[in-house]
Amino acid sequence: MKPSIVAKLEALHERHEEVQALLGDAGIIADQDRFRALSREYAQLSDVSRCFTDWQQVQDDIETAQMMLDDPEMREMAQEELREAKEKSEQLEQQLQVLLLPKDPDDERNAFLEVRAGTGGDEAALFAGDLFRMYSRYAEARRWRVEIMSMSEGEHGGYKEIIAKISGEGVYGRLKFESGGHRVQRVPATESQGRIHTSACTVAVMPELPEAELPDINPADLRIDTFRSSGAGGQHVNTTDSAIRITHLPTGIVVECQDERSQHKNKAKALSVLGARIHAAETAKRQQAEASTRRNLLGSGDRSDRNRTYNFPQGRVTDHRINLTLYRLDETMEGKLDMLIEPIVQEHQADLLAALSEQE
């Protein structure tokens, strides 16, 4: 391993021990904000510190085995130990490189998930419903909470658009690669000739930001309209103008929220989604400005981004970004998404590692 990387790991290991000592300090325990921040830092450093300790131990084992090679009686055993230790050292070095990759500060956050029907009319709305169900199943399996913020139902089922907040550990980091265009190829229920139709939906995943980090929005830049909500809600539906539509005039971003009966709650929800959308637009703009020649696996949520194709007649799902095809469509639609998410996360890590070695 390069001396520069070893030096970096030693510094992180020392910081881990320092933070551990600080967490036992009565003054820090009394300061809840500081204690929480240090607890987070400790958790982030724990894996790299533990892995580095294991790596150091293996280097000692290699040294011991090499010394034993000089003893004819011990040579055979030493060779076997040396081979095993070198293998383990390589594995730990790979793990450490991944642990050293720059972390996206948003990865641990909750996320807003938007699914929007694109080309394909009723069939696109039905597919948007299928996609939302797929993500809900995935969230359920990971014990995440799904809260619908706003939805507009399709005429024959599904959704023209649905926005949900997904809360839990590492939601954004896991779902961020879902942003982009999703195509479906299947025979619609209304198709009498049995012809396969192609429809499309767009998915956008944005981190939920803490209030302190939300972009500054000038109230003068907002147009706020109220209207009567439609959809489920029993006797209270259409009796009050509780639904909210907020338009951010400088960007043209529009957010509607009609899920709550209270206008204030709908407004608060709509503003949090608006803040996340503005932040996402600014981030995308920044990434484009830095736009390296390196490919960006993170979709923009744009229809032109073709992430995946779900082909029902063939039972096939294809991720076009990494040329991955699986004939496991039924499982995918039931929310078993790790087999699609994991390869793209690994590909992203490989790209980051390549960038890191170029810098060095």
UniProtKB/Swiss-Prot annotation:
One of its GO terms (cellular component) is cytoplasm. The keyword Ribonucleoprotein does not apply. One of its GO terms (molecular function) is translation release factor activity, codon specific. Keywords: Cytoplasm, Methylation, Protein biosynthesis. Methylated by PrmC. Methylation increases the termination efficiency of RF1. The modification N5-methylglutamine is found at residue 235. Residues 284-313 are annotated as: Disordered. InterPro entries: PCRF, Pep_chain_release_fac_I, Pep_chain_release_fac_I_sf, Prokaryotic/Mito_RF, RF-1. It is found in: Cytoplasm. Belongs to the prokaryotic/mitochondrial release factor family. HAMAP family: Rel_fac_1 (MF_00093). Peptide chain release factor 1 directs the termination of translation in response to the peptide chain termination codons UAG and UAA. NCBIfam families: prfA (TIGR00019), PRK00591.1 (NF001859). This is Peptide chain release factor 1. It comes from Salmonella arizonae (strain ATCC BAA-731 / CDC346-86 / RSK2980).
